[in-house]
From Swiss-Prot:
Protein name from the UniProt record: UPF0758 protein RSc2444
GO biological process: proteolysis
Pfam families xrefs: RadC, UPF0758_N
UniProt short sequence motif JAMM motif, positions renumbered to this chain: 173-186
Residues holding Zn(2+): 173, 175, 186
Protease among keywords: yes
Keyword match Cytoplasm: no
Length: 224
């Protein structure tokens, strides 16, 4: 049955307008994005199939163009729409960080990092460079590595901090395995970077490890 034939209160779009987006399932939200289904399948049916194929909404959103387009009916136009939506979300979170003091909105920082790094297949080390009031100056992905490791060069981080005239920064890297507990090497690296940057009068405010579903903050766990 087409969604247009459903009772009004069950249709995803009407449900969102009357009850808010939190009331919708992943499949219902995705159906609004898809707009239409296929012969014999409603948009909700198609959304459920996509979620089952990729395993989760996060994996679907971060599928490669080749993986996404391999699904019948999901061509380059839908892929472009999806990634435009993701980029809008990233930029909105980045603006929220930029216009407020970063430490006053740690959840915004976590959301931005999770959306940006959480589903990357290789380890990426990145920095948020901040001014004296802890507002965002720049975001840079500095090093990329393998599934388990990205080689980090403290001198390069120091050079970028000086380039941006940063007074502080937040370190971040993802764990593609999804486990966010810091390793011993993560702890050692953080201490080394704190010492090296302190010589330049640049303060490391936090180091965040990003997984698919959560973000670990060194500051919140008393490790800074």
């Amino acid at each position: 049955m087409a969604i247009a034939d459903w009772p009004a209160h069950e249709r995803p779009r009407e449900k969102l307008l009357t009850q808010g987006p939190a009331a919708l399932s992943d499949a219902e939200l995705l159906a609004i994005f898809l707009r239409v289904g296929m012969p014999g399948k409603s948009a909700v049916d198609l959304a459920r199939e996509l979620l089952a194929h990729f395993g989760s909404l996060g994996r679907l959103c971060h599928a490669s163009r080749r993986e996404f387009s391999a699904i019948h009916g999901m061509g380059p136009a839908k892929y472009a729409q999806l990634h435009a939506l993701l980029e809008v979300a990233r930029r909105a979170l980045k603006e929220e960080i930029a216009y407020g003091q970063t430490l006053e909105s740690p959840q915004s920082v976590k959301d931005f990092l999770r959306l940006t790094l959480g589903h990357r297949p290789q380890e990426v080390f990145a920095c948020l460079f901040l001014d004296v009031r802890h507002r965002l100056i720049a975001w840079e992905e500095l090093f990329q590595g393998t599934l388990t490791e990205a080689r980090v060069y403290p001198r390069e981080i120091a050079k970028r901090a000086l380039h941006h005239n940063a007074s502080a920064l937040i370190l971040s890297h993802n764990h593609p395995t999804g486990h966010v507990e810091p390793s011993e090497s993560d702890l050692v690296l953080t201490r080394e970077l704190c010492r090296a940057l302190a010589l330049l009068d640049v303060r490391v405010l936090d180091h965040m490890i990003v997984g698919r579903a959560e973000v670990y903050s060194f500051l919140e766990h008393g490790k800074m």
